[in-house]
């Protein structure tokens, strides 16, 4: 699908943030194993969460879908209904449920799709190997097969690549036989780890933070085996990752301000860092009872480290195109194993719109030089966050056509509907 986004001034001053797929996927995973029925209200309808529910059912959980709620009846030990799981294009789904699959005493295959077929899964295989689990067929284009069962162990792991495997390990090891001690080095996305710990605690799982050195990115965790998650009722928090695009839109296109609601946070979210990034970039915002209010204005410049919140690169790279001075975004190395190679895609696609982007792997930075934005046709490269970022260039700069606009369904299906409700002019392009 190709959409054309035209320069627009917002005509409405309030929008609700989408539900957090990061929170919901963690709840689904634990609810799959939990004793009793977990009731999820305000669920995310993203493709990633749809696939997470499919995998929960494939592992033996019973799923009931309501109008604005989902009920999950967990089962443990797992009773897989199929020999394979279908994560779709979800990196978290692959790694989280790939580790849960190791709780089963037998092989289960992870059927990857789309861009996920080319993403690196060596971290999953290496981590599971440390706990006696073999993973076969991990090359690009292959469907990994996990051979459980997983057992507790004392291990040292490199956690520099992603926090997603660690999330799966914490969920699974609590239910495995034997206790575990995880000595983690190079921990990235610490806020995502914290989110996992908080969801685990709410569902009755104890994980002890024995020691932490934040400066050295080292973390020592103790997980007692033989636990069982407890069902709970939970309303899914609003998603700061999706809200970041709405907040950027408010800065660039609101006549005065934009209220982004539904952002009361039960759990830690890495991308809440968008608030600090905007403030340091000279933007004005204030808290409200239900979320945040952003004021319209021209950003000065962004100088921010996004190592722990790499999903903020696309919205900030779009905002930076309209700043007064060049912006420097640190954490470039985190962008290579996403739905696209986001660093290079931002560089190549922004160039089509007349925006120069420099990538420096030595300093781990992306430098975005401000506009003016030129009319162009950009490709999402099948990446939901690139489609949303391209829409910001069109709404605030010059007409932008977006190839593959449907990619937003991965995390924020009604993104373009929400933009239109705010007054952004969007046209469907034939062909």
Across the structure, where does each feature detected by a protein language model lie?
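Short, structured segments at the rim of ligand-binding sites
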Residues: 1-431
């Amino acid at each position: 699908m190709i959409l054309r986004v035209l320069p627009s001034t917002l005509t409405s001053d309030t929008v609700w943030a989408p539900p957090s797929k990061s929170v919901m996927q963690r709840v689904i995973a634990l609810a799959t194993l939990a004793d009793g029925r977990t009731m999820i209200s305000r669920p995310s309808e993203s493709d990633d969460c749809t696939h997470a529910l499919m995998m929960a059912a494939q592992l033996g959980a019973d799923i009931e879908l309501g109008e604005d709620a989902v009920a999950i009846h967990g089962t443990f030990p797992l009773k897989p209904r199929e020999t394979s799981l279908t994560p779709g294009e979800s990196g978290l789904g692959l790694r989280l449920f790939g580790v849960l699959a190791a709780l089963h005493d037998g092989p289960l295959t992870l059927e990857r799709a789309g861009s996920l077929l080319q993403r690196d899964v060596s971290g999953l295989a290496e981590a599971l190997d440390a706990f006696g689990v073999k993973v076969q067929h991990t090359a690009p284009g292959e469907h990994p097969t996990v051979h459980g069962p997983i057992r507790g162990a004392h291990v040292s792991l490199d956690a520099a690549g992603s926090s997603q495997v660690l999330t799966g390990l914490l969920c699974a090891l609590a239910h495995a036989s034997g206790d575990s001690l995880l000595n983690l080095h190079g921990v990235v996305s610490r806020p995502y780890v914290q989110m996992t710990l908080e969801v685990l605690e709410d569902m009755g799982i104890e994980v002890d933070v024995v020691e932490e050195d934040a400066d050295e990115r080292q973390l020592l965790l103790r997980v007692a085996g033989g636990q069982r998650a407890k069902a709970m009722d939970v309303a899914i928090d609003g998603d700061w990752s999706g809200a970041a695009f709405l907040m950027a839109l408010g800065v660039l296109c609101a006549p005065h301000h934009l209220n982004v609601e539904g952002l009361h946070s039960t759990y830690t979210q890495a991308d809440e860092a968008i608030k600090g990034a905007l403030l340091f970039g000279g933007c004005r915002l204030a808290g409200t009872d239900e979320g945040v209010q952003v004021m319209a204005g021209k950003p000065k410049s962004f100088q921010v480290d996004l190592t722990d919140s790499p999903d903020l690169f696309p919205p900030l790279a779009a905002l930076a195109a309209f700043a007064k001075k060049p912006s420097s975004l640190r954490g470039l190395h985190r962008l290579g194993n996403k739905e696209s190679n986001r660093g290079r895609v931002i560089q190549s696609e922004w160039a089509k719109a007349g925006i120069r982007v420099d990538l420096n792997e030595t300093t781990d930075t992306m430098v975005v030089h401000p506009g003016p934005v030129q009319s162009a046709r950009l490709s999402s490269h099948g990446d939901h966050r690139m489609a949303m970022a391209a829409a910001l260039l069109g709404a605030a700069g010059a007409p932008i056509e977006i190839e593959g606009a449907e990619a937003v369904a991965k995390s924020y299906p009604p993104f373009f509907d929400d933009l239109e409700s705010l007054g952004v002019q969007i046209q469907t392009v034939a062909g």
